[in-house]
């Protein structure tokens, strides 16, 4: 639903990365995939930023939390 704004800028619709690549199971051991959904500080990015569906966002969130407990991903990334 790209809308015309006053400045002539059209907002591009975000695509669900998981659905687009037909990923059925989000594995907590796949840190490369999970790092797409984490900010530089280590926080889980919201749906409005990543464009994932609600169902896939829940899968990603549980996988990230499992990976954090297993020490595959950091809880907080302090620089």
UniProtKB/Swiss-Prot annotation:
InterPro entries the record matches: Ribosomal_bS18 (IPR001648), Ribosomal_bS18_CS (IPR018275), Ribosomal_bS18_sf (IPR036870)
Keyword match Zinc: no
Keywords recorded for this protein, A-Z: Ribonucleoprotein, Ribosomal protein, RNA-binding, rRNA-binding
Family: Belongs to the bacterial ribosomal protein bS18 family.
Record's subunit section: Part of the 30S ribosomal subunit. Forms a tight heterodimer with protein bS6.
Chain's role: Binds as a heterodimer with protein bS6 to the central domain of the 16S rRNA, where it helps stabilize the platform of the 30S subunit.
Name assigned to this protein: Small ribosomal subunit protein bS18
């Amino acid at each position: 639903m790209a809308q015309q704004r006053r400045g002539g800028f059209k907002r591009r619709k975000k695509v669900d990365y998981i659905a687009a690549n037909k990923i059925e199971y989000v594995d907590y051991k796949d840190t490369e995939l999970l790092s797409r959904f984490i900010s530089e500080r280590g926080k889980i990015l919201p749906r409005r930023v990543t464009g994932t569906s609600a169902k896939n966002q829940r899968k990603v969130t549980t996988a990230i939390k499992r990976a954090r407990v297993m020490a595959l991903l950091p809880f907080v990334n302090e620089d």
